[in-house]
Amino acid sequence: MRQGSIPGAHGRVRPLGLLGDPVLHARCAEVTDFGPELAALVEDLFATMYAAHGVGLAANQVGEAVRVFVYDCPDDEDERHLGHVVNPRLVETGGVVVRGPEGCLSLPGLEAGTERYDEAVVTGFTVAGEPVTVRGTGFFARCLQHECDHLEGRVYADRLTGRRHRKLMRQVARASWHR
């Protein structure tokens, strides 16, 4: 039997920022107030992520330039990882670099082969201010690195070069959501 509420059950679905929105391309500020507004933001992030069928979502993707992300993401063994991190730090990456398909709720409908390590460790805090360490492998490691990138003002397209980058940018230009 499940203990506690389902993440996002009390949150509201917020509009998603899209590639080109300034908040997506600037480093986010550290969270200093671990109060009810932060808890409400985490609930909103979960609600928005689930509504968009995502596996992770950073606060700046809903217009909040603070260092918070949520996730509900499987690893390569299909083990589910569910949680959030406030003021995350990507403290370790390792294993091998794998080029795999990567998408983003801020570039809807698009994906590109993006290189990421297959192991990652993130430290940070919960909404209650308790320290947390999250370890990921495979797809979940990719998710952790992707969300940490968002909070630094980067999207996966920024990691692409050459032909892959040009191809993705052509797809962005043709996308119905592109301004």
From Swiss-Prot:
It comes from the Bacteria. It comes from Streptomyces coelicolor (strain ATCC BAA-471 / A3(2) / M145). This is Peptide deformylase 2. InterPro entries: Peptide_deformylase (IPR023635), Peptide_deformylase_sf (IPR036821). Fe cation binds at residues 104, 146, 150. Its EC number is 3.5.1.88. Removes the formyl group from the N-terminal Met of newly synthesized proteins. Requires at least a dipeptide for an efficient rate of reaction. N-terminal L-methionine is a prerequisite for activity but the enzyme has broad specificity at other positions. Belongs to the polypeptide deformylase family.
